[in-house]
């Protein structure tokens, strides 16, 4: 025998839970299915366990999509300040870390508990270990538009909301099911790829593994001209850190990125001044004042930099060194992939989704929210804000039916 819920949400992540809470609050019956044992698994892992739940500065310019105007309506309707107010009302204390990033003081569990208590309070049902294996569309029936096979039970609904997320962090249950639903109904999917993700070394750069654990502030620039100033971290696999994760959104395979290792210094000026004041100084002495000692020593060991008395260094060699430090061209072998990626770029094509309601323009009652869509935010709470804003737009639209 079939079970019925007017609204069914697939996925108990940030977007799915928030949409369920809002729908229930607006008086709609809603059931959430998730294939995992726990709700909000990615929320719990995010921000080092403290959940960077939004940012003080949220604009459409912080998002990438094939349809760059798509995010405007939802972000304007439910803003970062709306979510900050909700968090404050619930008594959750938070702090700004850097660049407007807001984190919970006491841990990401607080956000998950808040979403769950909102669902419980208004009667939204959450069913875990519930694998949706099949979705069918019913024609000419306003009440039942979709039939789902969930484990061994058939469920029917009027509205189906796909909040399945992307492919990043497969260890937390990520699957391509949301994309498969879209394709089943003829909705195009922009090819997904790992994003906000570390770069890996090519064979020729493997010597840099000796720097694992060292970080420094850099300016990193993609071929398209986009640049970020933040920390770069050397790892045993490649380069990571906020600067690298941010630029990975703008990097294309086979391209190089340009890295300024001393964006706050004019190396040429500092060497020339040292030539005047202390011409017998060794080059290494100057460089270790500016850069991590281990990095300078590795350059000397590899023959990239020659340690000598600075008075003997020609203008041409100074210029070559300066170019290397301020314009290091790094060509990644690739990225670490979905295993460590924070988000997935690409997804359900927003050109065929209503930016006001998140409903498919082709299939009535079929909605897509959150990361499953072709919307990728910068690092720093922007992807969570997209989850809240897109979920709210969807819930508000359904509540007015």
UniProtKB/Swiss-Prot annotation:
It catalyses: a 5,6-dihydrouridine in mRNA + NAD(+) = a uridine in mRNA + NADH + H(+). The gene is rdsA. Belongs to the BaiN/RdsA family. RdsA subfamily. Catalyzes the synthesis of 5,6-dihydrouridine (D) at position 2449 in 23S rRNA. NCBIfam families: aminoacetone oxidase family FAD-binding enzyme. It comes from Haemophilus influenzae (strain ATCC 51907 / DSM 11121 / KW20 / Rd). Keywords: FAD, Flavoprotein, NAD, Oxidoreductase, rRNA processing. It holds the Pfam family HI0933_like. Transmembrane segments: none annotated. InterPro entries: BaiN-like, BaiN-like_dom, BaiN-like_dom_sf, FAD/NAD-bd_sf. Gene3D superfamilies: FAD/NAD(P)-binding domain (3.50.50.60), HI0933 insert domain-like (1.10.8.260), Translation factors (2.40.30.10). Its EC number is 1.3.1.-. FAD binds at residues 15, 34-35, 41, 47, 52, 132, 371, 384. Its cofactor is FAD. This is Ribosomal RNA dihydrouridine synthase. The keyword Flavoprotein applies.
């Amino acid at each position: 025998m079939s079970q019925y819920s007017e609204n069914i949400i697939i996925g108990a992540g940030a977007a799915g839970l928030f949409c369920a809470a809002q729908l229930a609050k607006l008086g709609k019956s809603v059931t959430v299915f998730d294939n995992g044992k726990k709700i909000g698994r990615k929320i719990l892992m995010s921000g080092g366990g403290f959940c960077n739940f939004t940012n003080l500065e949220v604009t459409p310019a912080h998002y990438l999509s094939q349809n760059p105007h798509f995010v405007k309506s939802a972000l304007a309707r439910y803003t970062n300040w709306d979510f900050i107010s909700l968090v404050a009302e619930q008594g959750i204390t938070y702090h700004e870390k850097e660049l407007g990033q807001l984190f919970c003081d006491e841990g990401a569990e607080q956000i998950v508990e808040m979403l769950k208590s909102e669902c419980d309070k208004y009667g939204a049902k959450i069913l875990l270990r519930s694998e949706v294996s099949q979705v069918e569309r019913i024609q000419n029936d306003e009440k039942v538009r979709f039939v789902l096979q969930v484990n061994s039970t058939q469920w029917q609904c009027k509205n189906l909301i796909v909040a399945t997320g992307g492919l990043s962090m497969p260890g937390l249950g990520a699957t391509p099911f949301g994309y498969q639903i879209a394709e089943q109904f003829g909705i195009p999917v922009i090819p997904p790829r790992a994003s906000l993700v570390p770069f890996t070394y090519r064979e020729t750069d493997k010597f840099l593994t000796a720097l694992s654990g060292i970080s420094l502030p850099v300016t990193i620039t993609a071929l398209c001209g986009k640049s970020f100033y933040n920390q770069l971290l050397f790892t045993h696999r490649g380069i990571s850190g906020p600067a690298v994760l941010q630029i990975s959104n703008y990097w294309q395979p086979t391209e190089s990125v340009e890295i300024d290792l001393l964006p706050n210094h004019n190396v040429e000026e500092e060497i020339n001044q040292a030539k005047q004041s202390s011409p017998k100084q060794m080059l290494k002495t100057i460089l270790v004042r500016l850069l991590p000692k281990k990095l300078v020593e590795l350059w000397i060991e590899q023959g990239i930099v020659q340690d000598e008395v600075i008075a003997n260094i020609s203008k041409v060699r100074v210029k070559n060194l300066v170019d290397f430090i301020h314009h290091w061209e790094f060509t990644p072998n690739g990225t670490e992939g979905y295993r460590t990626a924070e988000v997935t770029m690409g997804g359900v094509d927003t050109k065929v989704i209503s930016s006001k309601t998140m409903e498919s323009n082709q299939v009535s009652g079929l909605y897509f929210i959150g990361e499953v869509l072709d919307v990728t935010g910068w690092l720093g709470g922007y992807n969570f804000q997209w989850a809240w804003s897109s979920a709210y737009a969807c819930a508000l639209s359904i509540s007015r039916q």
